[in-house]
Regions:
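Active-site-adjacent pocket scaffolds in enzyme catalytic domains
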Residues: 1-86
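C-terminal domain-boundary segment and adjacent tail
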Residues: 63-145
Length: 145
């Protein structure tokens, strides 16, 4: 459906085990989700530590040491791939409204370390080379051919 709509890629897969999202057994790097489709799936970057995949974007980036994401980006770059990083725009707004009656787990996930996020992002951007996703898709698609 995405390819039919003109999309060249998706980055919807997180190769991790998680209670709300994730596909534990997904490939860590680009793949074609449908055999005869031109669509390329670019899984978000995870750190591989002791045989496990650890998420490094979004709330995990916010709450875990930045060194983990740095490690993951260096790891995927060393294996010849680009880091695929994501965050949610609301994660750089420490003054966002709070949902008073939200469960504690949701509060921890959504509000922890919001004030640190912008600085962590600036540091991540400065420490690594980043590029345009169209170039990444073209390179990864060529590797899949």
């Amino acid at each position: 459906m995405l390819a039919e709509a003109g999309y060249a890629y998706s980055s919807s897969v997180a190769p991790v085990a998680h209670d709300h999202y994730g596909w534990r057994d997904a490939p860590r790097y680009a793949f074609r989700p449908l055999k005869d489709s031109p669509l390329v799936e670019l899984p978000v970057t995870v750190a591989r530590v002791a045989g496990r995949h650890i998420a490094t974007g979004g709330g995990f980036f916010r709450m875990l040491p930045g060194a983990l994401t740095d490690f993951a980006v260096r790891q995927v770059n060393a294996e010849g791939h680009a880091g695929i990083f994501y965050f949610h725009p609301w994660e750089v707004d420490p003054d966002q409204p709070r949902v008073a009656n939200a469960p504690l787990r949701s509060k921890v996930r959504h509000y922890s370390r919001l004030g640190a996020m912008a600085g962590k992002l600036r540091g991540l951007i400065a420490r690594h080379d980043w590029g345009r996703v169209d170039a990444v898709v073209a390179r990864e698609a060529a590797l899949l051919a």
